[in-house]
Amino acid sequence: MGNFGRVPVGIVGASGYGGVQLVRLLMDHPEIELVYLGGESSVGKSFASLYPHLAHAVKLSIEEVDPEVIARRCEVVFLSMPNGLACQIVPTLLEKGCKVLDLSADYRFRNLTTYTTWYGVERSDRTTADTAIYGLPELYRDRISEAQLVGCPGSYPTASLLALSPLLKQGLIVPETAIVDAKSGTSGGGREAKTYLLLAEADNSLAPYSVVRHRHTPEIEQICSDLAGHEVTVQFTPHLVPIVRGILATVYATLRDPGLVGDDLTTIYTAFYRNSPWVKVCESGIYPQTKWAAGSNLCYIGVEVDPRTGRVIGMSVIDNLIKGQAGQAIQCLNIMMGWDETLGLPKMGFYP
C-alpha cells in the first residue's frame, strides 16, 4: 500500500490526452496514490514540463516502461498506449499480481482473429486475452468486480452501446436494422499532430471518416451480438465535428412492436439504467447535447419513436475523454476494488 493506506497506481502512456485525463482525475481520488508515470517519447521529462498547468499538483517525471519495475511499485496499472503495445507487457504485470486496466483495443475482443483483422497486429497472448473483461460497467459490472484485467471500451462504442443496450437486451428491435451515426470532437484523434485535426482543416467543417471501415465497428457488433444472443451486423459511420471534446451517437432501428411510443421507451430506458449512477435518461421530448456531459463521467440519453417509419431513435452523449476513456477506466477500478462506483469522478459537467 502507498502512503496513508492508499493504493499505489501507475500510468503507462501518461503524456497523451487519455493519460493526462487519468493523471488529473487520479490526483483527486481519495483512495489512490499516483506513484509512476511511464512513456517512450517523453522519458526523463517532468510531467510539469509537458503540462505546466498541472505543475502545482504533479511532481513526477516520465520513466522508462519496465514491467518489472512497474509491478514492484504499483498495485494497479492503467495503460494508455497505442494499439498493439499493451499486449507486450500485460502478461508480466498480471503474473506479478497487478490489476491492469487497458485503454487501448488490445483486450476488448474475445476473438483475437477479429482484432488482428481490424488492427493488423498478430497476437501470441491468447491465454491472457481470454481472462480480460470488457469494461462497460453498465452491462458487465459483476464481471468487472472480479477481474484482474479489464479492456476498457472505445469512446464511440461506449456512447453507441449505452444507447442500444436496452433495445437489444429487451428484444425491442430487429437487431440487423441498427444504424449508428456518431459525431466526435477532435480530441478523439489524440495529441499527435495530424493534418485533418489542424484548426484550418477541422474548423467550420463536419466530415465523415473511415466510412465502412472504422475499427470500432467490430467492437460495437461484438457487444450487440452478446446482448441479442446471436451475431449482429451494425452500420456505423463516424464524423468529425469542430469541437474539442464530446460524442453524440444517434442510433436508429426498427421496432418489433410498432405500437410503442416515446414515453414507453423512456420508461424502459429509465428502468434499465436504474442502478447505473452515470447514465441519465432524459424526460420524454428532451434530447441530450454534448455540452451537458463535457468534463463529467456522465452519459445522457434521449429516446424517441417515429410512428411513420416504426423506428426508434436513441441519442447518447458523453465526454469522449472521460466517460469515453479515462473516467470509465477509473469507474471500472472503483468496481474492481469494491469502492463506490462514483468515487473520485466528476459528477457535474462544464457549462456553458
From Swiss-Prot:
Gene3D superfamilies assigned: Dihydrodipicolinate Reductase, domain 2 (3.30.360.10), NAD(P)-binding Rossmann-like Domain (3.40.50.720)
Endpoints of the signal sequence: none
Annotated catalysed reactions: N-acetyl-L-glutamate 5-semialdehyde + phosphate + NADP(+) = N-acetyl-L-glutamyl 5-phosphate + NADPH + H(+)
Any one Pfam family match given in the protein's UniProt record, by short name: Semialdhyde_dh
Keywords, ordered alphabetically: Amino-acid biosynthesis, Arginine biosynthesis, Cytoplasm, NADP, Oxidoreductase
EC number: 1.2.1.38
GO terms assigned for molecular function: N-acetyl-gamma-glutamyl-phosphate reductase activity; NAD binding; NADP+ binding
InterPro entries reported in the protein's UniProt record: AGPR_type-1, NAD(P)-bd_dom_sf, NAGSA_dehydrogenase, Semialdehyde_DH_NAD-bd
Pathway this chain belongs to: Amino-acid biosynthesis; L-arginine biosynthesis; N(2)-acetyl-L-ornithine from L-glutamate: step 3/4
Cellular compartments per GO CC: cytoplasm
CDD domains found in the cross-reference section: AGPR_1_C, AGPR_1_N
Task performed by this protein: Catalyzes the NADPH-dependent reduction of N-acetyl-5-glutamyl phosphate to yield N-acetyl-L-glutamate 5-semialdehyde.
NCBIfam families registered for this protein in UniProt: argC
UniProt similarity note: Belongs to the NAGSA dehydrogenase family. Type 1 subfamily.
Name of the protein in its database record: N-acetyl-gamma-glutamyl-phosphate reductase
Gene: argC
